[in-house]
């Protein structure tokens, strides 16, 4: 597994291949399609991330000291965003997650190219991932 920095750099490099934001959105949509199936029974209110315009469910499990995330959303771009985040942070220790400054979203221009409500949702997703990591130190 790549280090977190290596994974972040790979994402920055991947996004830099696309000049137009429309192409970057298409890439996010494809990322969202790569999420593993999320059971309907798991789409409960306690797994909903508050602060997102779209519904985003996030759960996790800890195995061998590493936090593994699973997520889904009812909106395709939002699903891609959460897929990007869990692709980076799933399978890492809580300390690794908390050591991240999550600047990758700024480096790829994601936050500034989202609508204000989606940008708020992104902040909420990051906060929830950090909260889960904090609870599993």
Which ranges hold each PLM region?
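A short interface-forming secondary-structure element
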Residues: 73-74
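Short Cys/His-based metal-binding microdomains
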Residues: 78
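Alpha-helical support elements that line or immediately flank enzyme active sites
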Residues: 81-92
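Short conserved catalytic/interaction loops centered on acidic-Pro-aromatic/His motifs
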Residues: 94-100
């Amino acid at each position: 597994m790549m280090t977190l920095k290596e994974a972040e750099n790979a994402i920055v490099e991947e996004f830099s291949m696309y000049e137009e934001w429309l192409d970057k959105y298409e890439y996010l949509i494809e990322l969202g399609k790569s999420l593993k199936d999320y059971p309907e029974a798991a789409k409960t209110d306690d797994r909903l991330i508050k602060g997102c315009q779209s519904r985003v469910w996030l759960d996790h499990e800890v195995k061998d000291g590493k936090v593994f995330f699973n997520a889904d959303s009812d909106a395709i771009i939002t699903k891609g965003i959460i897929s990007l985040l869990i692709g980076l942070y799933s399978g890492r220790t809580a300390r690794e997650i908390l050591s991240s400054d999550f600047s990758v979203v700024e480096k790829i221009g994601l936050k500034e190219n989202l609508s204000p409500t989606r940008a708020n949702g992104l902040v909420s997703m990051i906060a929830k991932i950090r909260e889960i990591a904090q609870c599993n130190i």
